[in-house]
A protein has these predicted regions:
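Alpha/beta enzyme core
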Residues: 25-30, 78-92, 96-102, 106, ...
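N-terminal targeting peptides
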Residues: 1-3
Length: 172
């Protein structure tokens, strides 16, 4: 018996809930273990955009979908609480792997890897949050092995090893 898991990564603007549900119906047939949603980027208003609301609404997700958070600050924890309280998710994925120039320039996605102290503070805030602990919320991270060089990986991995992450995904 294989322990292989198959996940479908998101592509912003393409892999919304309609795509994920149709893909699973016609191709996945239950063979995909998780479908990652396009990232949600918390904002100052503490509200989701209409398209984000449609995408994260459990009524629109007939399959095992996982919300992805992209941030550069632990202030996004309100987003996680809303995802769990209002939509019933029990896992979030922190995106520390997106290589897009516009994302990296805001120190989000793989841009977080340039400052491992901040990355550690963010993970600490998430993992020590009472709500997340009390409700046994799983936290996974999508990352790269470095922002400039693969030699950065050891320092990055040292940060991740300090936390009980559900999974760590390496973005190629």
């Amino acid at each position: 018996m294989s322990n292989t898991k198959v996940y479908l990564a998101p592509m912003e603007g393409l892999t919304d809930y309609m795509f994920r549900n149709a893909f699973d119906e016609f191709f996945g047939h239950g063979k995909i273990d998780k479908y990652f949603m396009p990232f949600i980027s918390p904002n100052q208003t503490e509200k989701f955009l209409a398209k984000e609301m449609r995408d994260i609404d459990r009524n629109n997700n007939l399959i095992n979908s996982l919300p992805q958070i992209m941030t550069n600050t632990p202030d996004f924890i309100w987003t996680a609480h809303m995802l769990f309280d209002n939509f019933g998710y029990n896992e979030i994925n922190l995106n520390a792997g997106c290589p897009s120039g516009t994302v990296v320039s805001k120190s989000k996605g793989s841009g977080m890897l340039a400052d491992t102290d901040r990355l550690e503070r963010i993970l600490y805030e998430i993992m020590s949050d009472n709500y997340i602990q009390d409700n046994n919320i799983k936290v996974s991270v999508k990352t790269r092995i470095g922002i400039e060089s693969p030699d950065e990986w050891y320092n990055i991995l040292e940060v991740y090893n300090k936390f009980s992450l559900e999974e760590l995904f390496i973005h190629p």
